[in-house]
């Protein structure tokens, strides 16, 4: 089973003391966002090892390692998990006789980090809880070449969103209905989808190519590297971007979060942690 990561974060009250804590200590120098965990900041950071499995599994079988640091201006989060296979292609174009066709058997490893904007938080997407999250997504093929993450909002509502909002109706754990939408933040994203080339070049060419992000879509840096059967992924963002679609962090603030992992973009296994707490010193 392969793991990729997603961190979902929410501000809360009393329940914060009941969950394991990921402590983000203040450091003089933040780590370089290069997909490596050899910086001094990471060596001194406190590690949290969290169980990760299917949402309803009470005794997780896998573990994921988390660390966090900040410098008073920006925060960095490090995720490390075991994955025996490196999947860093996503539906590339493969030459088939006389034309390029998407190879849908190739799907990337994937992880995301989300922070609550409104409502009660539950790490289970099918909990049926109305809420909004600020979400960061790292993708081994689509985002990693650019050094940035997708920055978007997850919204869960009982009422159907306006027709202009692309949404999906899901059945929750109690057999109720909830609508899910996940628009990207305003601005230019860190990759774009291209048309298949008409003339043959390489046998396989990417369908998604990096581009320079701008606006709120450029808030989150992210870089991952696979080595020795593990993914190492680093994220970095300002504590407070000033954008309405981003969760604001601050020293002394405690925030609920969870980590989810996607094998080959959920064409394989999808796992998630129970609720954890990010504590910013």
Annotate each PLM feature:
Residues 179-223:
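Glycine-aromatic-enriched beta-strand/loop faces of beta-sandwich-type recognition domains
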Residues 79-83, 233-240:
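Short, hydrophobic/aromatic-enriched beta-strand segments in well-ordered soluble domains
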Residues 3-12:
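Sec-dependent N-terminal signal peptides
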Residues 15-90, 198-203, 207-214, 259-281:
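Order/disorder boundary and secretion-linked terminal/linker segments
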Residues 16-36, 93-195, 227, 241-281:
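Acidic/polar low-complexity flexible segments
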Residues 64-67, 220-226:
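Beta-strand-rich interaction surfaces with strong enrichment in secreted/lumenal proteins
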Residues 72-76, 110, 228-234, 254:
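A generic structural signal for beta-strand entry/edge sites
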